[in-house]
Structure formats: C-alpha cells, structure tokens
C-alpha cells in the first residue's frame, strides 16, 4: 500500500514538472530574453529524471522484478530515457536544440502512461515464465534506450527537413522577386539582400547543428538497438530454443535496424548527408512507432505480453 501510494505520488509529480517545463519552453520560444526561465526548465527536467528514477525503483521493490514487463512500465522507462538523454549533454551548454525534442517527448510518454487508457495495467503483476530471466534487464532496457535515442535523432532530422524546405522555398521566391525589384528599388535592394543573407547564414548554421546532433544521437541509439537485438536473440534461444522466430515484434525491430543502418551508410557519402540522410531518418521515425505501438495493438506473437489491455485488442 505504501509503495503504491508513493508510486502514484511520484508519477504525478514527474508529469506535473514536465508539464511546467514544456510551458516554460513555449514562453522562452516566444520571448528569447527570459534566460532565467530557460535555466529553470533545465533544472525541472533534472528533477523529473530523479522523480521517474524513484518511481522505477519503487515499482522494482514492490513487484520484485525490474519494471520492464509490460507497456506501462516500458513507457515510464522510455520517459526516463528521454530525461536521461536530456541531462547528459546538459553540461555542454549547447543543447538547446536537443532539449526542444527531449522535453516534449518526455511529456508525451509520461502523459500517455499516466492516462486512463492504461489504467488496467498500472498495477504490477507476477512475471510470466518467459520473462523470468536475467536477460530481461539487458534486452528490454537496451531496446527502450535505443528507441528513445533514435526517436530524438529522427525528430531532429524532421526539423532539419522542415527548415531546409523553408530555406529553399524562400531562396526561390527571393531569386524571382529580386529580378523584378532590382528595376524599381535601387539601393533598397542591397539592404534587403544583406538582411536576407544574414538570416540565411543563421539558418545554415542551424541546419548544420541539427545534422550534427541527429547523427550523434542516432548513432548512439543504433548501438543500443543492436545490443538489444543481439541480447534478445540469445534470450530467445534460451527460452524458445531458437535465436530468431520472425515474430511481429522481431520483424519490425529488424526493419527498424535496417532503416537506420541505411541512414548511417548514407552518412559515409558526403553527397548524401544533410537532407538526403534526414529523409531516411524521418522514415525511421514512423517505423519505430509501428514497432513499439503498432505491433502492440495486434496483441499477437511471442511478445503479446507487452500489448495493450484486452479491451483494446
């Protein structure tokens, strides 16, 4: 009873803090001069990380097993992973871009986990025999950490595509408008061109940062995903007598791995970096959600214990 109450308190405290952090981010996005608010939001994410950590530890003690046995627990761990990705580079002082991704991601997963949709699986239950293994922590934690990093990196790539598209569109309109205006505006054209060049330079720098961070984060996530798949194969051989069974979850995890392997391969070609590789990462973003949520909607296969409640199947 005590652990259940403590878990309930920590869940809603962490969700409330993340909600406040998102509000602060929106305010600082509109008013750049409010620096103290941004610092408060960074500290809020750190507090959220420790709250979710306490929640996981509390659930671990109360259930007797590491809390990664169902969808609710994996969502909490996913939210914890987003918070971890946020605070690790915090001390580098140049993570404003990354924080814009990890903050909303944390509140989305935390909000969905604490919503009424998953009420039926909030309570911890006895592990099914297939999950009663030391491989549970290794396999599932690596997979969730991999998903979190890949989702963050993919969202950075999506942002890169949006900014690149807007930049190219404005360049197109500006080049056409410049020919018409040059006959009428005279010296004003030079002033407008200088302003446009400065703005274009800022966007180019932003695109480079997005490309840099998306590659770094996706590389980290790909490493976690690879370890998770390999450890899962070893665990599957011990539990079911086969390293690979082409279960829906396994199949989509393999597809996810292939997509991001293609992304990393495109990065080796200088001509395919930037927008081209970002397109592949954006496709990977959709594939991850199919693998993580879409397969759970089916509730079939060897991984059906991680599906939605029976009322949704």
Swiss-Prot record:
The keyword Chloroplast applies. GO terms for molecular function: heme binding. The keyword RNA-binding does not apply. Disulfide bonds: none annotated. Keywords: Chloroplast, Cytochrome c-type biogenesis, Membrane, Plastid, Thylakoid, Transmembrane, Transmembrane helix. InterPro entries: Cyt_c_assembly, Cyt_c_biogenesis_CcsA, Cyt_c_biogenesis_CcsA/CcmC. The chain crosses the membrane at residues 9-29, 44-64, 71-91, 111-131, 143-163, 217-237, 244-264, 278-298. It comes from the Eukaryota. GO terms for biological process: cytochrome complex assembly. It is found in: Plastid, Chloroplast thylakoid membrane. Belongs to the CcmF/CycK/Ccl1/NrfE/CcsA family. May interact with Ccs1. Required during biogenesis of c-type cytochromes (cytochrome c6 and cytochrome f) at the step of heme attachment. This is Cytochrome c biogenesis protein CcsA. It comes from Nicotiana sylvestris. The lineage of its organism: Eukaryota, Viridiplantae, Streptophyta, Embryophyta, Tracheophyta. The gene is ccsA.
């Amino acid at each position: 009873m005590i652990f259940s109450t403590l878990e309930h308190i920590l869940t809603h405290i962490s969700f409330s803090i993340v909600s406040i952090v998102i509000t602060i981010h929106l305010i600082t996005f509109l008013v750049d001069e409010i620096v103290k608010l941004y610092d408060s939001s960074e500290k809020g994410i750190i507090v959220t990380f420790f709250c979710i950590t306490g929640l996981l530890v509390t659930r671990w003690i109360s259930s007797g097993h590491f809390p990664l046995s169902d969808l609710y627990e994996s969502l909490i761990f996913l939210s914890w992973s987003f918070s971890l990705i946020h605070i690790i580079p915090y001390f580098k002082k140049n993570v404003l871009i990354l924080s814009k991704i990890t903050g909303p991601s944390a509140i989305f997963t935390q909000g969905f986990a604490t919503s009424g949709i998953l009420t039926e699986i909030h309570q911890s239950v006895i592990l099914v025999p297939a999950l009663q293994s030391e491989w549970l922590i290794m396999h599932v934690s690596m997979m969730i950490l991999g998903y979190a990093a890949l989702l963050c990196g993919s969202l950075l790539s999506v942002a890169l595509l949006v900014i690149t598209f807007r930049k190219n569109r404005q360049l197109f309109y500006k080049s056409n408008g410049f020919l018409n205006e040059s006959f009428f505006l005279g010296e004003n054209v030079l002033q407008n061109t200088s302003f446009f060049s400065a703005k274009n330079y800022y966007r180019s720098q932003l695109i480079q940062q997005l490309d840099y961070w998306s590659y770094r984060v996706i590389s980290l996530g790909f490493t976690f995903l690879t370890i998770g798949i390999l450890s899962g194969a070893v665990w599957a051989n011990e539990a079911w007598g086969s390293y690979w069974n082409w279960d829906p979850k396994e199949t989509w995890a393999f597809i996810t791995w292939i997509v991001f392997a293609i992304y990393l391969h495109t990065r080796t070609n200088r001509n395919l970096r930037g927008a081209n590789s970002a397109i592949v990462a954006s496709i990977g973003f959709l594939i991850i959600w199919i693998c993580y949520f879409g397969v759970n909607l089916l509730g079939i296969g060897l991984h059906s214990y991680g599906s939605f409640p029976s009322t949704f199947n």
